[in-house]
C-alpha cells in the first residue's frame, strides 16, 4: 500500500512537471544598463571559422551589440504600418519580399516576390499586441529579444532602417574574434555565461520544463536577485552571441530555400552554444527561441 501511494505521488509530480509554461505569467524585471541601440565595429581581415578553424575573411562592417528588442520591433511596426510598408492580414503582419532566384534543385521551394509573413499576432508566444491602432509590447518584455519573427520579418526590419542581416561569416567573426575559441567569451561554459537549457537563470521554470528569454545584455557580470552572471561579451563587445535566442542570418544559398540561424538558444544544451553550431528552417518559420540582429556596411 505504501509503495502504491508512493507511485501515485511520483506520477502526480511528473504530471505537474509536464504542465505547459504560462507564457503570460509575470516575469522578473531587471535593468541591465546595456543600450540596444549600440553598434560594434568589426575590422576587415582574416579569422578562424567553423569547427575545424578554417581561414576566412570579411570586409569591415558594423553589427548591433545586442539582438533587436521587442520594443524596437514594435516601434518599427508602428512606423511601417503608418507608411504602408507592412499590412495586416487577419491575425498576421505581412510585408513585401522581392523573391529568390529559383534553380530547380531537388526539394528547393520557390520563394516568389510578394507579401510574406513577418510575425503572427495570433500566436500565443507573440509578445507584441495590436489594439487596432498601435502596436505595444507585453509588459516586462520590452528589453527582451524580439522572438516569434520569421526570416522575412527579420529581413524586413533591417531593410526598413537601411541595414541588413549579417552573413554567417560576419556573424561568426563578430562572435569569435580572430582566435580559435569555441564560445564568445573563451574556452569553457558555466551557467552564469548564457541563457541555455538548465542554466538555472531567474527566467527559467524547470518545474514545467520550460524557460523564458532573458533581457538583452543580461550576462554582463552583474548580480540579479542573487544570480551571478559572468561578463560574456565577444571580443568585439557583443552580448548574447551564445544562448537566449537563435539568430537569423542573411545568406540565401543557391538551390536552397532554407535560411540559417546561429548562436543556440534558451532551449538548447550548453554544447550547442559553440560558435560553429548551425540551425536552419524555412523563412516562414517562427519560434519563441529565434530572434535576430542587424549589420551594416561601414
Model-derived features: where do they sit?
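Active-site microenvironments of metalloenzymes and redox enzymes
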Residues: 60-185, 202
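GGW-centered surface loops in extracellular recognition modules
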Residues: 30-41
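Short, solvent-exposed loop/turn elements at domain surfaces
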Residues: 47-55, 70-75, 83-86, 226, ...
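C-terminal motif of bacterial Sec signal peptides marking the signal peptidase cleavage site
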Residues: 16-17
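Primarily auto-inhibitory N-terminal propeptides
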Residues: 25-29
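Short, structured beta-strand segments at or near domain termini in extracellular proteins/domains
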Residues: 288-298
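Functional-site microenvironments in short loops/helix caps that host divalent-cation chemistry
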Residues: 129-279, 288
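Bacterial N-terminal signal peptides that target proteins for export
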Residues: 1-6
Amino acid at each position: 500500500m505504501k509503495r502504491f501511494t508512493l507511485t501515485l505521488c511520483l506520477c502526480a509530480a511528473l504530471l505537474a512537471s509536464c504542465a505547459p509554461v504560462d507564457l503570460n505569467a509575470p516575469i522578473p524585471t531587471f535593468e541591465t544598463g546595456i543600450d540596444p541601440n549600440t553598434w560594434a565595429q568589426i575590422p576587415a581581415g582574416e579569422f578562424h571559422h567553423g569547427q575545424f578553424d578554417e581561414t576566412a575573411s570579411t570586409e569591415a562592417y558594423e553589427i548591433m551589440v545586442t539582438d533587436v528588442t521587442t520594443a524596437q520591433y514594435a516601434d518599427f511596426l508602428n512606423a511601417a504600418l503608418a507608411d504602408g510598408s507592412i499590412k495586416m492580414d487577419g491575425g498576421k503582419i505581412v510585408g513585401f519580399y522581392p523573391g529568390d532566384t529559383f534553380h530547380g534543385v531537388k526539394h528547393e521551394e520557390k520563394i516568389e516576390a510578394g507579401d510574406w509573413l513577418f510575425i503572427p499576432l495570433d500566436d500565443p508566444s507573440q509578445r507584441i499586441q495590436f489594439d487596432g491602432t498601435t502596436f505595444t509590447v507585453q509588459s516586462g518584455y520590452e528589453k527582451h529579444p524580439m522572438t516569434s519573427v520569421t526570416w522575412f520579418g527579420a529581413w524586413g526590419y533591417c531593410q526598413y532602417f537601411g541595414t541588413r542581416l549579417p552573413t554567417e561569416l560576419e556573424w561568426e567573426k563578430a562572435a569569435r574574434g580572430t582566435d580559435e575559441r569555441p564560445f564568445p567569451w573563451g574556452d569553457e561554459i558555466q551557467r552564469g555565461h548564457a541563457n541555455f537549457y538548465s542554466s538555472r537563470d531567474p527566467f527559467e521554470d524547470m518545474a514545467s520544463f520550460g524557460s523564458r528569454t532573458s533581457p538583452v545584455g543580461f550576462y554582463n557580470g552583474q548580480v540579479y536577485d542573487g544570480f551571478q552572471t559572468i561578463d560574456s561579451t565577444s571580443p568585439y563587445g557583443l552580448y548574447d552571441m551564445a544562448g537566449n535566442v537563435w539568430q537569423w542570418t542573411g545568406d540565401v544559398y543557391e538551390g536552397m530555400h532554407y535560411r540559417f540561424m546561429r548562436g543556440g538558444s534558451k532551449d538548447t544544451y550548453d554544447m550547442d552554444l559553440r560558435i560553429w553550431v548551425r540551425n536552419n528552417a524555412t523563412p516562414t518559420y517562427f519560434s519563441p527561441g529565434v530572434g535576430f540582429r542587424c549589420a551594416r556596411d561601414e
